[in-house]
């Protein structure tokens, strides 16, 4: 029991470190800023899509009210009134205004994808038709799915009202769980579809459940904070709704991005996190496995790498592949597999060290031992290199920068 608790604490610390390293708070701030401009366009698009289907006619306002009642703290009621007014006015725009709203909505989706790709270490975002189709699917299918879900909710409610509470056993419980179910579905779809990387559906679902529960808890606590500590009302008066709503949007994006960090790192094993090998060592180990597979006439995928003892998670694998593909070491073989397509006999380690984006590890970060035949001579060479560097550059800066030193001068 204690071991599981320690593992949980270790994993939580690891997630917190990754959350900060991936600049998630900065991304949440950028998304908050973008949301201010995109919330009205997104709602306008939602109403437009729902109005195309007669069965969903007039349901947009009901969905908007449902969202604000269940996903925004009570302090957002005033904002809801303003947004309804803005959305009503936006429906009377000319085609130029409609295009501007669509571009604004797409900009928000681009910012979300950029933040997720940063977390998943994806350096090559979607481009062209693939990106457009994804965004169009979100903007078009999202409102339709919301409309369908809300229609089911309305049907269950009306059935209970007309035929009594016994018409559908558990209807009250089901209706109470609908907001949480919508949140789980939305977050699961977000985590599985938006990153330009392979995300296991099981991990996306686990992250969706975690984020939805955390979101509900945060909504309750935020509502209590606003009601018990009305400092914003005292300072801003009638305008207090604006900073409170901004703070809630920022907190919401922080929760969403933390859930993304969780989903991304569910594939990382406890053993791999504890080893914390320098990225250069991992790169050489991966190249060694590629070479072995090439000699056998076989391609390589992440599962093969795991069987060889390199248990790196999906995001690190994608990051290494990005570098290896740019340097023309590997090529796609189809089916998610890769092959070595460069003669390693014509590529020196010195060149790799110069081209590698990750720094050479210090002596303290080098593992004492590694079950790889190439590692002992590499370790000795790195130690010799660091000894020579210390001998060459061990003098103080005052020695190097003073007049008349033996250091080289630029003329």
Swiss-Prot record:
Superkingdom classification of source: Bacteria
Cellular compartments annotated: Cell inner membrane
Membrane topology: Multi-pass membrane protein
Keyword annotations: Cell inner membrane, Cell membrane, Membrane, Transmembrane, Transmembrane helix
Gene Ontology cellular component annotations, sorted alphabetically: plasma membrane
Pfam families: Virul_fac_BrkB
Membrane-traversing stretches: 36-56, 92-112, 132-152, 174-194, 207-229, 244-264
Main localization of the protein described in the UniProt heading: membrane
InterPro entries: UPF0761_bac, Virul_fac_BrkB
Family: Belongs to the UPF0761 family.
Protein's recorded name: UPF0761 membrane protein PA0951
């Amino acid at each position: 029991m204690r071991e599981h608790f320690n593992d949980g604490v270790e994993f939580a610390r690891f997630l917190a470190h990754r959350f900060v390293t991936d600049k998630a708070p900065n991304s949440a701030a950028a998304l908050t800023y973008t949301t201010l401009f995109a919330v009205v366009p997104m709602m306008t698009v939602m109403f437009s899509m729902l109005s195309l289907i007669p069965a969903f006619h007039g349901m947009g306002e009901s969905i908007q009210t449902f969202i604000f009642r269940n996903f925004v703290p009570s302090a957002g009621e005033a904002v809801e009134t303003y947004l309804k007014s803005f959305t009503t006015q936006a429906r009377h725009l000319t085609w130029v205004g409609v295009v501007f709203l669509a571009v604004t909505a797409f900009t928000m989706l681009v910012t979300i994808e950029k933040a997720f790709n940063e977390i998943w270490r994806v350096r090559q975002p979607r481009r062209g038709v693939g990106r457009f189709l994804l965004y169009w699917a979100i903007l078009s299918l999202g409102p339709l799915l919301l409309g369908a879900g809300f229609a089911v909710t309305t049907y269950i409610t009306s059935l209970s009202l007309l035929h009594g509470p016994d018409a559908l056993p558990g209807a009250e419980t089901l209706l109470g769980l609908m907001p949480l179910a919508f949140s789980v579905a939305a977050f699961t779809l977000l985590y599985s579809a938006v990153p330009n990387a392979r995300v296991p559906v099981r991990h996306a679902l686990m992250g969706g459940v975690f984020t939805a529960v955390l979101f509900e808890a945060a909504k309750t606590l935020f509502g209590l904070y606003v009601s018990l500590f009305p400092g914003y009302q005292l300072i801003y008066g009638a305008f207090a709704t604006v900073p409170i709503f901004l703070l809630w949007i920022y907190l919401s994006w922080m929760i969403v991005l933390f859930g993304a960090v969780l989903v991304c790192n569910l594939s990382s094993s406890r053993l791999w996190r504890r080893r914390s090998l320098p990225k250069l060592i991992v790169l050489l180990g991966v190249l060694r496995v590629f070479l072995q597979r090439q000699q056998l006439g076989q391609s390589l995928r992440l599962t093969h790498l795991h069987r060889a003892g390199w248990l790196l998670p999906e995001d690190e694998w994608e990051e290494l592949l990005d570098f290896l593909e740019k340097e023309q070491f590997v090529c796609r073989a189809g089916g998610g597999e890769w092959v070595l397509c460069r003669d390693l006999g014509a590529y020196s380690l010195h060149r790799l060290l110069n081209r590698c984006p990750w720094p050479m590890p210090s002596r303290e970060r080098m593992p004492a031992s590694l079950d790889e035949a190439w590692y002992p001579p590499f370790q000795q060479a790195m130690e010799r290199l660091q000894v020579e560097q210390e001998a060459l550059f061990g003098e103080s800066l005052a020695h190097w920068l003073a007049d008349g030193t033996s250091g080289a001068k630029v003329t």
